[in-house]
């Protein structure tokens, strides 16, 4: 059996833009439905959605037959948690709240086997190796790992150039929701000051030769980020899409205008 090729990483290197969807429903059936819609990548959120290791495993299994590539965001950049996520088959991670080059370097080590890193060796127990059915898994697994780091506060912005320069970081994702809050514009990522910071960050990431990514459910902003050269852009969130559709349907039959969404334009 051959090691699965990380097509998300391949396309990042080619410079081809990839369109994604954020998944927070934490359910394999819902994840498969989203995959069937045709997105290039699907973010399985372990930071703000009620996911655990088993629910993420189920979603990875549900997505496996589809071309859309799974990206997992863990709750934090914990080495032991990263080891577990890689063992269940994750090949691309988006790690939140990365503030320094030293932190990014530690994450690079966490996704690699020794001697290049510190990932624990337990491939006989791991879905990633198909329980040691993938030939030469230990010798080639590192090649398919894709590490995305999320910069989303003022410290991270200040250290962005150093973070993007870290070897082994494949892409840098700008987190508009937390960044706007850190800049004093909580809930308003469309504020001109926030947008100026985001556009500058995208330019700096691309200048460093790394892929830039972002999430925005605002179509105008999402298209703007693509024009600026973002390589991976999530353009919606499953919970927001479902909530909006349900409110609209209820409103049509029960009368009255649908209740407005309390979410920022980041999530829809």
From Swiss-Prot:
Binding annotation for a divalent metal cation: 152, 178
Metal-binding is among the record's keywords: yes
Catalyzed reactions per annotation: D-glyceraldehyde + 3-hydroxypyruvate = (3R,4S,5R)-3,4,5,6-tetrahydroxy-2-oxohexanoate; D-glyceraldehyde + 3-hydroxypyruvate = 2-dehydro-D-gluconate; D-glyceraldehyde + 3-hydroxypyruvate = 2-dehydro-D-galactonate; D-glyceraldehyde + pyruvate = 2-dehydro-3-deoxy-L-galactonate
Enzyme's top EC category: lyase
Cofactor(s) this protein cannot do without: Mn(2+); Mg(2+); Co(2+)
GO cellular component: cytoplasm
Annotated signal sequence range: none
Pfam families: HpcH_HpaI (PF03328)
Cofactor remark: Shows a slight preference for Mn(2+).
Site (Transition state stabilizer) residue list: 73
Active site: 48
Enzyme Commission number, as recorded: 4.1.2.-
Gene Ontology terms for molecular function: aldehyde-lyase activity; metal ion binding
Keyword field: Cobalt, Lyase, Magnesium, Manganese, Metal-binding, Pyruvate
Gene Ontology terms describing biological process: phenylacetate catabolic process
Site (Increases basicity of active site His): 87
Role this protein plays: Aldolase which can catalyze in vitro the aldolisation reaction between hydroxypyruvate (HPA) or pyruvate (PA) and D-glyceraldehyde (D-GA). The condensation of hydroxypyruvate and D-glyceraldehyde produces (3R,4S,5R)-3,4,5,6-tetrahydroxy-2-oxohexanoate as the major product, 2-dehydro-D-gluconate and 2-dehydro-D-galactonate. The condensation of pyruvate and D-glyceraldehyde produces 2-dehydro-3-deoxy-L-galactonate as the major product and 2-dehydro-3-deoxy-D-gluconate. Also catalyzes the retro-aldol type decarboxylation of oxaloacetate, a general property of known pyruvate aldolases.
Recorded family membership: Belongs to the HpcH/HpaI aldolase family.
Name by which UniProt lists this protein: Hydroxypyruvate/pyruvate aldolase
Organism field: Pseudomonas aeruginosa
Classification lineage: Bacteria, Pseudomonadati, Pseudomonadota, Gammaproteobacteria, Pseudomonadales
Gene label: PA50071_1
């Amino acid at each position: 059996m051959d090691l699965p090729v990380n097509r998300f990483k391949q396309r990042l290197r080619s410079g081809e833009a990839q369109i994604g969807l954020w998944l927070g429903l934490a359910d394999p059936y819902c994840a498969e439905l989203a995959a069937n819609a045709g997105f290039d990548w699907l973010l399985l959120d372990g930071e703000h959605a009620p996911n655990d290791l088993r629910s993420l495993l189920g979603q990875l299994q549900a997505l496996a037959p589809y071309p859309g590539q799974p990206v997992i965001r863990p709750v934090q950049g914990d080495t032991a948690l990263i080891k577990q996520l890689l063992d269940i088959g994750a090949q691309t991670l988006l790690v939140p709240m990365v503030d320094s080059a030293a932190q990014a370097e530690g994450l690079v080590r966490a996704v690699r086997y020794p001697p290049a890193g510190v990932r624990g060796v337990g491939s006989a127990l791991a879905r990633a190796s198909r329980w040691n059915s993938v030939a030469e898994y230990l010798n080639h697994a590192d090649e398919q790992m894709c590490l995305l780091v999320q910069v989303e506060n003022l410290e991270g912005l200040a250290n962005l150039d150093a973070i993007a320069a870290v070897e082994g970081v494949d892409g840098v994702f700008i987190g508009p929701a937390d960044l706007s809050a850190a800049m004093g514009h909580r809930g308003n990522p469309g504020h001109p000051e926030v947008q100026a910071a985001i556009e500058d960050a995208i330019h700096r990431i691309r200048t460093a030769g790394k892929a830039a990514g972002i999430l925005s459910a605002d179509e105008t902003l999402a298209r703007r980020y693509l024009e600026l050269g973002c390589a991976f852009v999530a353009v919606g969130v499953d919970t927001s899409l479902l909530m909006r559709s349900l409110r609209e349907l209820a409103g049509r039959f029960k009368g009255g205008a649908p209740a407005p969404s309390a979410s920022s334009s980041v999530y829809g």
